[in-house]
Amino acid sequence: MKQFILENICMSDMSAPSVCSTDRFPTFESAMEEAHKQFKEEAKTYRKSYGADNITTEECYRDLYIKGPDFIDWWTAVEVTTAEEED
């Protein structure tokens, strides 16, 4: 059985990259649906805090980025092998 982990990674000028959350999903599509939901919510928050002109966003196949003057907030979906697949 395939599973996907949605990772949210935050990086800033003041700290090393850290994984903010890891959630498991049964399909790539469900992981990316949640990624887009979180991405849109956080983009609104960052635009209010930093100003819309200071925030850029990028969307790739399995990666979503919010970039600010001193940070990057990144979501990625990663396929993982479950114990059932290893047997």
For each feature predicted by the language model, list its residue ranges.
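A short, exposed loop/beta-hairpin motif centered on an aromatic-Gly-Thr core
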Residues: 16-33
